[in-house]
Amino acid sequence: MVRLFWNTHNQINNNTNNKKNAADHLWGIYHKENSNLWIKEILKGVEYSITESEKNIENGDVLIIVDSSIEKKIEQYKKLKLICSKIFLFHLGDESALHDLTDVYKNFDYVWRTFCHNKYFNSKLVQCIPVGYKSGVSDKKIASKKYKWAFIGTPHKSSRHDLLFQLSSIKENFCHKTEQFNKKIISVDTMSEVLSSTEFLPCPNGFVHPETYRVYEALECGCIPIVENAYKYYDRLFPNNPFIKIDKWSEAKDLVKDWTGDQIIKKQKECKIWWDKYKIEIQNFIGKKIN
């Protein structure tokens, strides 16, 4: 039997007096709440049952583990490897890639991980996948777009402040700024409504890594992502992608202000076709690896 086991919220040594362990526990809960529908979508090519406990895993099962803070769990993986006929990992988080995970990953038949780094781009054991969209974000299919651009997030870096400075004069726009990650956020339904009503979504780099949820939420909701071209990250992750890429936000200002309706509609369609095709390709690849 193929079983799916979410393990992100089950943290080893969950001592809340230890700040690192407490943070890992909170991140594990966050991943389960916010990435479950993305993982479900990319696993469409696999028939599986969900197990809530490793106690339900039986000898000979094919196991798919979704996990984070994996550097702490190598003994658990070694034990499961002895029981299962095959074992696969979806590794969430790990933006900074601080740990050498060679000894962890070798317990698995194959690994998919978010937040790609140089050593994983050409790996035979590991494939990088998008961080995906937040669970519940969906296209409201609003034809007439109310906003030229939108920003939803924390302006924690100079690049983000420059983004807001450059684009603030362009109306109409929607701007929801938070002081801290995941604090005073808008609901996913409101976000879906806003993004589905927006033409362009500037997607600045994340705090540690270039990738963020916003790129994929833009694609899900039919608006055009504008990404920073740092290290040509998105071209390495997605060759021939249709994203608009800029080196500085003043370039985005001219583009958002000057693009005509036909240009916008053409790029929206291009992004939608590419994203739908990409998701089918990753579903097929995962299905072939696991089945």
Question: Can you annotate each of these PLM segments?
Answer:
Residues N240-W259:
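Acidic, PIN/NYN-like endoribonuclease modules and their adjacent C-terminal/linker elements
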Residues M1-K245, W274-I290:
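Nucleotide-sugar donor-binding catalytic core of glycosyltransferases
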Residues D254-W274:
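Conserved donor-nucleotide binding/catalytic region of nucleotide-linked donor-dependent transferases
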